[in-house]
């Protein structure tokens, strides 16, 4: 019984290791939506920025429309 539990725990740990190693850049658009932002066109690219109300936060730059709210993109 203890051996089965140990095997189950080890397989779970291996699974979590593989899942956490997934390339996070592939999910940039999904992560953007998780931050609560609405996507907007930025620098001629399709939907690469997000709308921030009032002004862009630190670490972000204006890259698109000014009205009704600025379109911002992360620097870097």
Curated annotation (Swiss-Prot):
Belongs to the sea anemone sodium channel inhibitory toxin family. Type I subfamily. It is found in: Secreted; Nematocyst. The keyword Cell division does not apply. Gene3D superfamilies: Anthopleurin-A. GO terms for cellular component: extracellular region; nematocyst. Its main location: secreted. Residues 22-33 form a propeptide. Keywords: Cleavage on pair of basic residues, Disulfide bond, Ion channel impairing toxin, Nematocyst, Neurotoxin, Secreted, Signal, Toxin, Voltage-gated sodium channel impairing toxin. This is U-actitoxin-Avd7a. May affect sodium channels (Nav). The keyword Membrane does not apply. Residues 1-21 form the signal peptide. Disulfide bonds join 40-71, 42-63, 56-72. It comes from the Eukaryota. GO terms for molecular function: toxin activity.
């Amino acid at each position: 019984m203890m051996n089965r539990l140990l095997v189950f725990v080890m397989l779970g740990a291996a699974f979590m290791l593989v899942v956490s190693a997934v390339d996070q850049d592939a999910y940039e658009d999904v992560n953007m939506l998780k931050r609560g932002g609405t996507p907007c066109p930025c620098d001629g690219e399709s939907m690469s920025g997000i709308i921030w109300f009032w002004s862009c936060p630190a670490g972000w730059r204006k890259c698109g429309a000014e009205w009704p709210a600025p379109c911002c993109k992360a620097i870097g």
